[in-house]
């Protein structure tokens, strides 16, 4: 009896070890406590990485610029970031944009203190001209703010831009050390709820489309296309599930945001869902399709590339076709099992 038990135990261990060996490590980078990063948390809680044979190793960064810089040391393989750092990442490190995390045009904005908001309501241009705006340079918030300046007939040279991390900006607004800031959600909701700040103009109101980017190191994607496709399938499935289970998703969001030190009301969490369109596999493929001209995603990233050239962040305007690719989304679509996995809301 003892012998049979030992044999059974040995078989179980062998099977477990064999299964563990089938899991391929993949290094995933993102910025914590952000709406578009929620799928990574949901997928981990649901055990979906294992289902496609991946073992994720996560690394987080406070903003996109340090995140893309870390790719030079191969600190990560795939991930999500803002569209502005995604373009910068291509130019500096050969990073590919392989999909869109969400439309965050309403989630990047020019924010003002209560006092400044009152001035802005009377005369936006006068309230902004000559003022200092604290923001994180080369970010989606930077893009949104400069789009808003154009809306009111102003140029970058009409204001003073002061570079700060988002945590510093929250502190500055809360202590009345700044009146104007470029921010992204959920930091926007934090200062609205805790510092009485107001959104003066979102990227959407400024006429800008601000997509988030799913990214991969160029060399990693070329050598491991199936791993990249599996990564995308897991990410897309998480969005499908979140869309079908918003109440449970908000509960998970509360935990995910708290881990990154963010505490906002449930109403603000719901606003994340209501104002940030996300895209399933079919929509991703349609947005990235190049028939006889540039795709919709090409147009979005071309606008961002022009902005970055105008601000001096880039020496020339890169060709979008050199870094935006639907190759890996197509791999998901072409694999029946991956396609079914990616489109399931269960």
Task: Enumerate the language-model features and the residues they cover.
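Bacterial N-terminal signal peptides that target proteins for export
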Residues: 1-7
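Pocket-lining segment of extracytoplasmic ligand-binding domains
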Residues: 168-266
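Conserved C-terminal helix/tail region of periplasmic/extracytoplasmic solute-binding proteins
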Residues: 298-346
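Soluble non-cytosolic domains of exported or imported proteins
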Residues: 62-65, 80, 135, 139-140, ...
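Sec/Tat signal peptide C-region and signal peptidase I cleavage site
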Residues: 15-20
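Secondary-structure end/capping motifs
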Residues: 223-315
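Short, glycine-/small- and polar/acidic-enriched structural segments
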Residues: 21-163, 179-185, 200-202, 208
């Amino acid at each position: 009896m003892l012998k049979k038990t030992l044999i059974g135990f040995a078989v179980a261990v062998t099977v477990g070890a064999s299964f563990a060996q089938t899991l391929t490590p993949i290094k995933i980078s993102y910025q914590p406590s952000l709406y578009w990063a929620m799928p990574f948390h949901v997928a981990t809680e649901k055990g979906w990485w294992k289902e496609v044979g991946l073992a994720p190793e996560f690394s987080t960064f406070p903003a996109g610029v340090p995140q893309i810089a870390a790719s030079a040391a191969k600190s990560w393989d795939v991930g999500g970031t803002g569209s502005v750092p995604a373009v910068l990442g291509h130019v500096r490190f050969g990073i590919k944009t392989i999909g869109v995390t969400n439309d965050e045009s309403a989630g990047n904005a020019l924010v003002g203190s209560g006092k400044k908001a009152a001035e802005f309501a009377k005369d936006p241009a006068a309230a902004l001209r000559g003022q200092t705006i604290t923001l994180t340079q080369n970010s989606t918030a930077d893009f949104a703010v400069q789009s808003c300046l154009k809306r009111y007939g102003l140029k970058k040279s009409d204001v003073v831009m002061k570079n700060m991390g988002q945590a510093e900006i929250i502190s500055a607004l809360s202590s009345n050390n700044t009146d104007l800031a470029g921010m992204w959600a959920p930091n926007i909701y934090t200062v609205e709820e805790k510092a009485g700040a107001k959104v003066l103009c979102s990227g959407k109101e400024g006429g800008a489309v601000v997509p988030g980017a799913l990214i991969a190191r160029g060399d990693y994607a070329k050598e491991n296309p199936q791993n990249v496709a599996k990564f995308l399938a897991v990410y897309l499935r998480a969005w499908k599930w979140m869309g079908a289970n918003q109440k449970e998703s908000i509960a998970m969001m509360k935990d995910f945001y708290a881990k990154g030190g963010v505490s906002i009301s449930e109403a603000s969490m719901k606003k994340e869902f209501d104002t940030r369109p996300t895209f399933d596999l079919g929509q991703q493929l349609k947005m990235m399709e190049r028939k006889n001209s540039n795709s919709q995603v090409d147009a979005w990233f071309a606008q961002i590339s022009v902005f970055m050239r105008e601000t001096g962040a880039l020496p020339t305007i890169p060709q979008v076709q050199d870094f935006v690719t639907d190759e890996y989304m197509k791999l998901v679509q072409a694999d029946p099992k991956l396609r079914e996995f990616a489109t399931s809301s269960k």
